[in-house]
Swiss-Prot record:
Protein name as annotated: FKBP-type peptidyl-prolyl cis-trans isomerase SlyD
Keywords: Chaperone, Cytoplasm, Isomerase, Metal-binding, Nickel, Rotamase
Top-level taxonomy: Bacteria, Pseudomonadati, Spirochaetota, Spirochaetia, Spirochaetales
Ranges where the PPIase FKBP-type domain occurs: 1-95
Family annotation (InterPro entries): PPIase_dom_sf, PPIase_FKBP_dom
PANTHER family the record matches: FKBP-TYPE PEPTIDYL-PROLYL CIS-TRANS ISOMERASE SLYD (PTHR47861:SF3)
EC annotation from Swiss-Prot or TrEMBL: 5.2.1.8
Organism of provenance: Treponema pallidum (strain Nichols)
Gene: slyD
Pfam name, any one: FKBP_C
Intracellular or extracellular location(s): Cytoplasm
Length: 176
């Protein structure tokens, strides 16, 4: 069965940076299961998985545009210490949600200069080329229950069906 939209796919992977250092691996968190075509994984990897089959192993290099994008300088900001919880010591590497209400974004503290804190709203892997080694462990057609759970997840996380790529229903093509 080939991977196509509306398939539930289970993969094992190792992710490395340009130096060969392991950034992430399914050895740590277990195999990754996702529904193809719903933007649950980075676009470059999702595209590389199309038409792959159970048991297939491959390597793929994903440039920043297919992963977490280029670094956006306007997401690096200087803020006052008073913008953080008063009883929490602020240290480089800490992550906070910045913003108010439902419009928040995770930021990472990159520098602390007394009462001035430098934060970065870019994803930690923004601007990086990613190197994946992938093993496709299973592929099956998504059931109605799989899709219902996915729609519930998207509606509670603020994500859109198919990441704006179309409707929520089955594409009709199924897994091949």
């Amino acid at each position: 069965m080939k991977i196509a939209n509306e398939c539930v796919v289970n993969i094992e992977y190792t992710l490395r940076d340009d130096t060969g250092e392991i950034i992430d691996s399914s050895d740590v968190m277990g195999a990754l299961e996702y529904v193809q075509g719903h933007g649950m994984i980075i676009p470059g990897l999702e595209t590389a998985l199309i038409n792959r089959e159970e048991g297939e192993e491959f390597s793929v290099t994903i440039p920043p545009v297919g992963a977490y994008g280029e670094v956006q300088e306007d997401l690096r900001m200087t803020v006052g210490r008073d913008q953080f919880p008063p009883n929490v010591p602020i240290e480089v590497g800490m992550r906070f949600d910045a913003g108010s209400g439902g419009d928040s974004r995770p930021v990472t503290v990159t520098d602390v200069q007394g009462e001035t804190i430098i934060v970065d709203g870019n994803h930690p892997l923004a601007g990086k080329t990613l190197h994946f080694e992938v093993a496709v462990r299973s592929v099956r057609e998504a059931t109605d229950d799989d899709l219902a759970a996915l729609l519930f997840r998207e509606s509670t996380s603020g994500g859109g069906c198919g990441s704006g790529a179309g409707g929520c229903g089955s594409c009709g093509a199924g897994c091949h």
